Amino acid sequence: VKRDLPVGKMSGMLKIHKKLPLLLAVPTTAGTGSEVTLAAVITDETCHYKHVVMDYCLIPRYAFLDPGLSCSLPPDMTAYSGMDAMTHAVEAYCNRFCSPKMKAHAMKAVSLIGANLLTAYREPANKAARMNMLTGSYEAGIAFTNAYVGYVHAIAHGIGGLYHVPHGEANAILLPKVLAAYGSAVYEPLARLERKVRTSVAEDESREETDAVLAEAFILSLIHI
């Protein structure tokens, strides 16, 4: 995107300074959401570091979601990329700067991914599940490119660069732990997500459905996925 400039010099915000050709994105995973985001992540193998390049010119003009292109994705990659998309949505939703419009995108993503990830994993050729996963990843991409992500991604990028752990796998492991560490700061948004998608129900029906209880239920559902 910029001649004779190392990736490290483009790492960060708005450093490309160049108009790019028409960019069309056709995702084959669900996923990174890169078909609607302003970010590119490039691993420097020499120093084991992941450079994040962010610029508005990197947002594709058009995105084509074809479920048939993801039906051959292996189960492990389906799981990892699906949890990456889930993490995008949850972290964006919990961000205090997330607007109501972006919350709606994130909520839709969580609902779609939560309802379809296991089906896509178990039934790779299920085009309905694959399409719902692509749509969920797309919605999550819109949400986090506007509201950003949090500590889960910050830690996962470091681990991935140093130890070559698949990004989605790192996110899947870290997401419930980081959300639990946030404590009461995220009870309210997680409770709203749980009320909307009802991924799990408290086993003890006598327990009052407080924000804390619902947030705990949502975190447990992420572990069970």
Where are the predicted features?
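Glycine/threonine-rich beta-strand-loop-alpha-helix active-site module
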Residues: 1-68
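Glycine-rich phosphate/pyrophosphate-binding beta-alpha loops
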Residues: 31, 138-171
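Glycine-rich flexible loops
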Residues: 36, 87, 93, 98, ...
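Carboxylate- and glycine-rich phosphate/diphosphate-binding segment that chelates Mg2+/Mn2+
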Residues: 39-147
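Amphipathic alpha-helical interaction segments
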Residues: 104-108, 112, 132-135, 154-157, ...
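Gly/Pro-rich interdomain helix-loop hinge
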Residues: 162-222
